[in-house]
């Protein structure tokens, strides 16, 4: 999931290049936004990326034109290709982790992962095509309609910030659904086992009642024979119930361990990628600042 978070960041960049109508006037004062609640590493990375986009939008006109002419686009494309490799590796690892689960659950999760990977690959291919198209438009518009170019850039950045926040909240909900699904699956397994062996308990109670009625007869020998039969039946049922209780406990413990391992795997996948993205984005910021030169505009302070 960690890698999918990073892939989501890259895939969302495709939306920032969508065609928009040019605004009549560039808004120099950005609209206020709700504060970003960052408690997890990936949330902090999203917050820094979001603030970075706002900072780029506040740059001067000359600096914006220089930014559009840097090699940021090429480096972003390399980052996309690396992310796709990580997504593929993570998907294979996740499918191995889901091996012990039910076949229909494994098939459903694998299908969702394949669909997500296909959508991500399509989005990244669209990003490359749109980047080439937009770069050509920038070169054609330089010196002709700078105000329109700045307005389009500002609109792209605003749309990207909103998409980041919306998709981050959506992914929060999806994680909650998966966690709820794990708990629901465990409860269904326990309920299924209980339904299978509850009739045995009822049968034992019925036999006990019948034997008790027959034992009231004056024939002692018949009562003893029936008593022995009852004890044998009860011992058999007791052993079956005890065996199933042990199996239920083992299965519940196994499912808890799988859930914990799954969460640990998500954390171990995501944290290194967040650090790698932070380093790469830090490199991009340094290049942007190098292009800015002595510009008075400064980048926003990184959230701790």
From Swiss-Prot:
Its main location: secreted. The keyword Transport applies. Heparin binds at residues 160-163, 216-223. Gene3D superfamilies: Apolipoprotein (1.20.120.20). Sequence repeats lie at residues 78-99, 100-121, 122-143, 144-165, 166-187, 188-208, 209-220, 221-242. Residues 208-277 are annotated as: Lipid-binding and lipoprotein association. APOE exists as multiple glycosylated and sialylated glycoforms within cells and in plasma. The extent of glycosylation and sialylation are tissue and context specific. Glycated in plasma VLDL. It comes from the Eukaryota. Residues 78-242 are annotated as: 8 X 22 AA approximate tandem repeats. One of its GO terms (biological process) is acylglycerol homeostasis. GO terms for molecular function: cholesterol transfer activity; heparin binding; phosphatidylcholine-sterol O-acyltransferase activator activity; phospholipid binding. Residues 1-18 form the signal peptide. Homotetramer. May interact with ABCA1; functionally associated with ABCA1 in the biogenesis of HDLs. May interact with APP/A4 amyloid-beta peptide; the interaction is extremely stable in vitro but its physiological significance is unclear. May interact with MAPT. May interact with MAP2. In the cerebrospinal fluid, interacts with secreted SORL1. Interacts with PMEL; this allows the loading of PMEL luminal fragment on ILVs to induce fibril nucleation. This is Apolipoprotein E. It comes from Acinonyx jubatus. The lineage of its organism: Eukaryota, Metazoa, Chordata, Craniata, Vertebrata.
């Amino acid at each position: 999931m960690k890698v999918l978070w990073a892939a989501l960041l890259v895939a969302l960049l495709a939306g920032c290049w969508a065609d928009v109508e040019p605004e009549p006037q560039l808004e120099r004062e950005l609209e206020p936004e709700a504060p970003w609640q960052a408690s997890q590493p990936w949330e902090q990375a999203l917050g820094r990326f979001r603030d970075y986009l706002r900072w780029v939008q506040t740059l001067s006109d000359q600096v914006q034109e220089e930014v559009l002419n840097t090699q940021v686009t090429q480096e972003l494309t390399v980052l996309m290709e690396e992310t796709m490799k990580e997504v593929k590796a993570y998907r294979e690892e996740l499918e191995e982790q889901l091996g012990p689960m039910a076949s229909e659950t494994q098939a459903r999760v694998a299908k969702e992962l394949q669909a997500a990977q296909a959508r991500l690959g399509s989005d990244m291919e669209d990003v490359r095509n749109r980047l080439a198209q937009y770069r050509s438009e920038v070169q054609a518009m330089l010196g002709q309609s700078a105000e329109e170019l700045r307005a389009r850039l500002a609109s792209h950045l605003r749309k990207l910030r909103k998409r980041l926040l919306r998709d981050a909240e959506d992914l929060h909900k999806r994680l909650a659904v998966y966690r709820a699904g794990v708990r629901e699956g465990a409860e269904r397994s326990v309920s299924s086992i209980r339904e299978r062996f509850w009739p045995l308990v009822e049968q034992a109670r019925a036999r006990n009642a019948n034997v008790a009625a027959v034992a009231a007869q004056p024939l002692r020998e018949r009562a003893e024979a029936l008593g022995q039969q009852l004890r044998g039946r009860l011992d058999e049922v007791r052993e079956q119930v005890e065996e199933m209780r042990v199996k239920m406990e083992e299965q519940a413990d196994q499912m808890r361990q799988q859930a914990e391992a799954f969460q640990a795997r998500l954390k171990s996948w995501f944290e290194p990628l967040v650090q790698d993205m932070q380093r790469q984005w830090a490199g991009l910021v340094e290049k942007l600042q190098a292009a800015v030169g002595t510009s008075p505009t400064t980048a926003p302070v990184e959230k701790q």
